[in-house]
Amino acid sequence: MLDFFTIFSKGGLVLWCFQGVSDSCTGPVNALIRSVLLQERGGNNSFTHEALTLKYKLDNQFELVFVVGFQKILTLTYVDKLIDDVHRLFRDKYRTEIQQQSALSLLNGTFDFQNDFLRLLREAEESSKIRAPTTMKKFEDSEKAKKPVRSMIETRGEKPKEKAKNNKKNKGAKKEGSDGPLATSKAAPAEKSGLPVGPENGEELSKEEQIRRKREEFIQKHGRGMEKSSKSSKSDAPKEKGKKAPRVWALGGSANKEVLDYSTPTTNGAPEAAPPEDINLIRGTGPGRQLQDLDCSSSDDEGAAQNSTKPSATKGTLGGMFGMLKGLVGSKSLTREDMESVLDKMRDHLIAKNVAADIAVQLCESVANKLEGKVMGTFSTVTSTVKQALQESLVQILQPQRRVDMLRDIMDAQRHQRPYVVTFCGVNGVGKSTNLAKISFWLLENGFSVLIAACDTFRAGAVEQLRTHTRRLSALHPPEKHGGRTMVQLFEKGYGKDAAGIAMEAIAFARNQGFDVVLVDTAGRMQDNAPLMTALAKLITVNTPDLVLFVGEALVGNEAVDQLVKFNRALADHSMAQTPRLIDGIVLTKFDTIDDKVGAAISMTYITSKPIVFVGTGQTYCDLRSLNAKAVVAALMKA
């Protein structure tokens, strides 16, 4: 039983609607538009909203959307056929009204489609009932049951051809009998060895006697060979030679410890005084108060663009004429066959740029659904049309549904006289502590005091690393510059303690001391480690931070999808709250090491629908950027 079926234009006008079990289809359809159609996630033609499953089909030629909704616990096999039949009949019946392409004509048009829809629904339900469910074949009806048991027995290590030959030989031996040549050939080795095998004085030997004689024959036969081999091995044994002296190379140097020891003899291994730290080296270059946009372009790209324009300028009028004719051919409606080769190249290009394989397939499928049936422009080709649609989809994906403005949220928390809490999580070695220090420097440059909570009580050296960052940040922002106020401080309780308890104490300490922001550093953990994921979910549930940031590196491909999906799933499964807290944003690190392979940004944003808040581009405190969607897409589409 269907809950609803609705037909509406891409402009938002509902042309016709069928209400089944559901009272209203407004909520589910609005969720479909908001989460799928506007976000360019049309690779899969189904969408789940609460207890409903929605299936939809796009008509790009007439800018229509067909949506059917039913309970997700039901398995309705006729839905795909029904939506295709309704799409075909509705388009053919009301082609004139739809082709006018004006909102007024659509509003004034009468789309009496109720009887036709009920007829199509009845036919689809009857066709699904006619199809009898397939039953499993019984063993008696299978081919294996007709074979004899002996033919299915195979000897280990025996090939099928050898087995067939052995069976033929055994059959031939049975036909010839014991008086044939086979019996005489078997008796020959017995005469040579002098050990009678057959009957003796009219009496047959017992089994024990036969086994004993065969054992003696085996020992006599193989014992002599072993003696010969031992004698030959003794005679052929080479004489021991003296050890060869090692070769002394002309420029090989010396391996003596005294020669290789360059340490000062007076210090005796004692640590020297630490040299004064270079503030400019620590701070980096560039303004730290305002985040700059990420720039993925380079001089090489400009040179390549200039070089590519030179040969095009040298083309004659003949090439321009052929190009014009090629463009004129493009004015037609697109089909999947036309786009298939172009989409295959686009998919391979995205995978080569580090986009996860599954997401690349879904993106290309979404573009195909978006363009199928659409009429191209007069001077456009299939390649340019598909490429432009893919670029628009990628930009739409990178533009977040919810913008994270930390400075505004911190000011709002100040008005309520409480600290703004940010929790960093992620797998091992992605740069959580380093980028936490970069964000601390950015907040200090904007005049906010920061308390760093060392909740990584597992990794050796984690507290010392944060202590070093705190010392250097204090050198950049000493209390003398801020009226004697301590701008950055480390809160730590050592190793082996409960991370959730340390975070709770740090937040209470920040509230009492008047700190503006608390940055919580957590231990790196793999997404499959259930105990550590439970501890992270406990930390987030108990302390309810204002922002949960997932730190991921830009080097990963398919692993990014697995990490984010399992982190979100683990936080939801191990949370004790009624509405579990999930990841709010992403920090993308090591972006300076990937050149133009920026596909991880697409993978992470597509799988979570969460924004990339910060991008790490280096080792100094100023190497922090905000994401520029158009620059990332331009780098991604660069050949």
Curated annotation (Swiss-Prot):
It is found in: Endoplasmic reticulum membrane. Its main location: endoplasmic reticulum. The modification Phosphoserine is found at residues 178, 297-299, 474. Residues 420-637 are annotated as: NG domain. It is a peripheral membrane protein. The modification Phosphothreonine is found at residues 285, 579. Residues 132-317 are annotated as: Disordered. Keywords: Endoplasmic reticulum, GTP-binding, Membrane, Nucleotide-binding, Phosphoprotein, Receptor. It comes from the Eukaryota. The NG domain, also named G domain, is a special guanosine triphosphatase (GTPase) domain, which forms a guanosine 5'-triphosphate (GTP)-dependent complex with a homologous NG domain in the signal recognition particle (SRP) complex subunit SRP54. The two NG domains undergo cooperative rearrangements upon their assembly, which culminate in the reciprocal activation of the GTPase activity of one another. GTPase induced rearrangement of SR drives SRP-mediated cotranslational protein translocation into the ER. Component of the SRP (signal recognition particle) receptor. Ensures, in conjunction with the signal recognition particle, the correct targeting of the nascent secretory proteins to the endoplasmic reticulum membrane system. Forms a guanosine 5'-triphosphate (GTP)-dependent complex with the SRP subunit SRP54. SRP receptor compaction and GTPase rearrangement drive SRP-mediated cotranslational protein translocation into the ER. This is Signal recognition particle receptor subunit alpha. It comes from Bos taurus (Bovine).
